[in-house]
Design a protein with these regions (language model features):
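Primary mode marks residue(s) on the alpha4-beta5-alpha5 output face of response regulator receiver
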Residues: 30-62, 67-187
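Bacterial N-terminal signal peptides that target proteins for export
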Residues: 2-14
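C-terminal motif of bacterial Sec signal peptides marking the signal peptidase cleavage site
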Residues: 20-26
Length: 187
């Protein structure tokens, strides 16, 4: 009877590594159906698409006394907190209050809302067009971004249950996802 040979554990390591790499091909952020962007959210003439990023994070709200009322409360928006991934799923930056988009290389822009459109279905935060200005490094991934579109939003609305006076100061972190489409001047 011929001797049987079995793979040595050391020879399995490269095979397992290759299998893991092959599986990472499916680790990309989900690509939503083609997004039809309303005319109101189109970037200004003279700007071209730089890149699309996928945000995953939370929209943060705080229970506050409602201005101009006696005893009424509301969930007030504080800001987002999200990671930004590229089309391969690699985290390339973060998004936070300002609203700000900051790349891992230190380049950063802050935005001002120019247009707002309710999303299809109305069950998530609005789609936006924001004009941006550079407040970070002069060079880098986000250094030349001049406009940002927020589209394909999921979730992020304030809690449906009103907050009570006893909850003033408490925060609610509501999951959300969105596509951020970055534009830069055409050179």
């Amino acid at each position: 009877m011929p001797a049987r040979s079995f793979p040595r554990p050391a020879s399995l390591v490269p095979c397992m590594a290759l299998a893991a790499l092959a599986a990472c091909g499916t680790c990309k952020p989900p690509v939503p159906p083609t997004v039809v962007v309303p005319e109101d959210l189109k970037p200004p003439a003279g700007e071209t698409l730089q890149r699309t990023l996928w945000a995953t994070g939370v929209q943060i709200y705080e229970c506050r006394a409602k201005a101009g009322t006696t005893g009424a409360t509301e969930w007030a928006f504080l800001g987002p907190e999200a990671s930004l991934a590229d089309d391969k799923g690699a985290i390339v930056g973060k998004h936070y209050a300002g609203p700000s988009w900051e790349a891992g290389d230190g380049s950063k822009v802050v935005g001002t809302v120019k247009a707002r459109v309710d999303p299809p279905g109305g069950t998530s935060i609005p789609w936006l067009l924001l004009e941006t200005r550079n407040v970070g490094k002069a060079q880098g991934q986000f250094a030349h971004v001049s406009s940002v579109q927020r589209v394909a939003t999921e979730g992020g609305l304030p809690p449906a249950t009103p907050c009570a006076a006893a909850e003033i100061g408490q925060k609610a972190r509501v999951d959300y996802k969105a596509q951020y489409v970055l534009y830069a001047p055409t050179f």
